[in-house]
Amino acid sequence: MPVTPTSLADHLLVALPSLLDATFARSVALICQHDENGAMGVLVNQPSEYTLGEVLAQMDITTGDGDLQARMVLNGGPVHPERGFVIHDDARAWDSSLIVGEGLYLTTSRDILEAMARGEGPANAVVTLGCAGWGAGQLESELSENSWLTVPADAELVFQLPLEQRWQGAASRIGVDLFRLTDYSGHV
């Protein structure tokens, strides 16, 4: 009987210390979609060089909210780095949204940014440029190589925990101290 893969949507991937790839080292990725065709997610702990004010200005969206303008945009991953992805907690019917899990949504349409600029957006939102993608079987292979830990998604971690604490913070949700792990094993 064939094994049906378990979907990791609504989970966080936490890079293990042995994952040295420049893009994903010490990263935390929120998996938004995962099926037999592959997986898609966004990194939630890597700052980009842009503020939301700069991104909104590029899109000709104006706002007088200084806090919103100064908000950091995250590097969501190496796929479609020119495209915006908004992780949020607002169940309204945006033009292009995906339910990630309980209280977590991914929206890629302009209307959510316009609502945020007017002060009518989600209570909690993280804006990223780019996303991460895995082909069919690729994520499963990386998991079997011990590149990642999987942790149930946690809105408090995604929206509230400071960026520099998210990597260890996600692992600690399942009792793992990443600073005590080694990337080798063997006999003495």
Swiss-Prot record:
Gene Ontology CC terms: cytosol
SUPFAM superfamilies from the UniProt entry: VC0467-like
InterPro entries reported in the protein's UniProt record: AlgH-like
Pfam families attached to this UniProt entry: DUF179
Family recorded in the similarity comment: Belongs to the UPF0301 (AlgH) family.
NCBIfam families: PRK00228.1-1 (NF001266)
UniProt name for this protein: UPF0301 protein Smal_0940
Gene source species: Stenotrophomonas maltophilia (strain R551-3)
